[in-house]
Each structure stands twice: as C-alpha cells, then as structure tokens.
Curated annotation (Swiss-Prot):
The keyword Iron does not apply. Keywords: DNA-directed RNA polymerase, Nucleotidyltransferase, Transcription, Transferase. It catalyses: RNA(n) + a ribonucleoside 5'-triphosphate = RNA(n+1) + diphosphate. This is DNA-directed RNA polymerase subunit epsilon. A non-essential component of RNA polymerase (RNAP). GO terms for biological process: DNA-templated transcription. RNAP is composed of a core of 2 alpha, a beta and a beta' subunit. The core is associated with a delta subunit, and at least one of epsilon or omega. When a sigma factor is associated with the core the holoenzyme is formed, which can initiate transcription. The lineage of its organism: Bacteria, Bacillati, Bacillota, Bacilli, Lactobacillales. GO terms for molecular function: DNA binding; DNA-directed RNA polymerase activity. Its EC number is 2.7.7.6. The keyword Thylakoid does not apply. Belongs to the RNA polymerase subunit epsilon family. One of its GO terms (cellular component) is DNA-directed RNA polymerase complex. It is an enzyme of class 2 (transferase). The gene is rpoY.
C-alpha cells in the first residue's frame, strides 16, 4: 500500500498550508490503520525534525494521478 505523508520540515514554526510538503511510502501491512502507524513511526525515526500533519492511504486513482503530476517518488529510509 502507498501512503502519502503530509508534513512540515520543522516543528519550530506554526504549520502553514503553503509550506506543507509530502512524501510517499510503500508499506506492506494487513490494514490501513497498521499502515498509518508504521508510516508515522518510520518518519519519526528517520526524520525527527518533521512535523507530521496527515497520513493518507492512496487509492489506485489517486496513485495514478500522483504519478501523472510528476511529483511522485517513493521515499525509502
């Protein structure tokens, strides 16, 4: 399953929509909830400075759209 993680690059400033970034994780889990928990743990362990805003499971249609926009790249820690 592919998860899109929305985050701010620092926890020092208040979150602003304009500075929200995203990364994509490919996580092999049995449930959506387990995937969200695993995604949060991976990001917090590898990028503790990131302020995670939201974690979204991408449907097939959303995944296709993300690939078409050119911003899609799986992050590996």
């Amino acid at each position: 399953m592919i998860y899109k993680v929305f985050y701010q690059e620092t926890k020092e400033r208040s979150p602003r929509r304009e500075t929200t970034r995203a990364l994509y994780l490919d996580i092999d889990t049995s449930s959506e909830l387990e995937g969200r928990i695993t995604a949060r743990q991976l990001v917090e362990e590898n990028r503790p400075e990131y302020n995670i805003e939201y974690i979204e499971l991408l449907s097939d249609k959303l995944l296709d759209y993300e690939k078409e926009t050119g911003a899609f790249e799986i992050t590996e820690f």
